[in-house]
Amino acid sequence: MNIKSLLLGSAAALVAASGAQAADAIVAPEPEAVEYVRVCDAYGAGYFYIPGTETCLRVHGYVRYDVKGGDDVYTGSDRKGWDKGARFALMFNTNSETELGTLGTYTQLRFNYTSNNSRHDGQYGDFSDDRDVADGGVSTGTDLQFAYITLGGFKVGIDESEFHTFTGYLGDVINDDVVAAGSYRTGKIAYTFTGGNGFSAVIALEQGGEDVDNDYTIDGYMPHVVGGLKYAGGWGSIAGAVAYDPVIEEWATKVRGDVNITDRFSVWLQGAYSSAATPNQNYGQWGGDWAVWGGAKFIATEKATFNLQAAHDDWGKTAVTANVAYQLVPGFTITPEVSYTKFGGEWKDTVAEDNAWGGIVRFQRSF
């Protein structure tokens, strides 16, 4: 056997061996395609599909810092220094289509911090601890402000009362409820009918609200009941609501009208009446039988909006507030505001001073 024959035989043997090993080799599977996040534009900006589902999710919120000085326009007391408050609000919306309509949820978590020189106003923080923050100090708290489910016109969960939401709240000022218009957060079951001609109606069963000093929740099986009617068009809107409080067995009602004078200037007026002439109730929290609120908004430029609100109640409280909301850059707004309250009539005996002047500057980054 010559060397050439030996080399050819060795090469043939190596090829045969490698072929046998290849037959037994494990072939790695192809990696699955990655499902990237898809934009969902069916419900507005900021939504995306939750991977693997047809549910759209939006995550948004704001960071806010307030600095207050002067008098407390709610109580008439002198702050004797600066009051500060911070809030981080985180919001989640989900929406998907079903055979019964749009199925949605909304939740809002609030992380609050307050550092007050002389008192607290209840706007920030959880004041359930042992410290007397009414005399100054620091308080923090976490709050589940909203958590509700919607299906078509049906809504159930934690929300704000239809006595406020259906008629459109008050004005676009920070100190809007010096003359109070009712409690806000409540558990509720509600149904809203929306017609195609601008007409809508609502009926709601509510648990009632509470604040730092008072609890207006129901004390049995009978819920608070709210009903309302609204008509809206290009000119503006008119809305009315009636509420029954089973705890005190009294009722309250209000009517609001909004008029768009131009595309930049609008005015509104609201009147309310309660069968119980006391602020200590869930809905008619103004003083006396009746109260009125009114205001105006003027969009001066793309960055600056002027807001004005005035209110007066049967017991003699008058409150006026004005501000300028200035958008420094998109998503960041600075709002200086000044407020005045005159405590007349029956309110004189409940406050330290008859006249109160206060100011606030709010810095808010929304995302």
UniProtKB/Swiss-Prot annotation:
The keyword Signal applies. GO terms for molecular function: porin activity. GO terms for cellular component: cell outer membrane; pore complex. GO terms for biological process: monoatomic ion transport. It is a multi-pass membrane protein. Keywords: Cell outer membrane, Ion transport, Membrane, Porin, Signal, Transmembrane, Transmembrane beta strand, Transport. It is found in: Cell outer membrane. Consists of 16-stranded beta-barrel sheets, with large surface-exposed loops, that form a transmembrane pore at the center of each barrel. The pore is partially ocluded by a peptide loop that folds into the pore lumen. Forms passive diffusion pores that allow small molecular weight hydrophilic materials across the outer membrane. Belongs to the alphaproteobacteria porin family. Monomer. This is Porin Omp2a. The lineage of its organism: Bacteria, Pseudomonadati, Pseudomonadota, Alphaproteobacteria, Hyphomicrobiales.
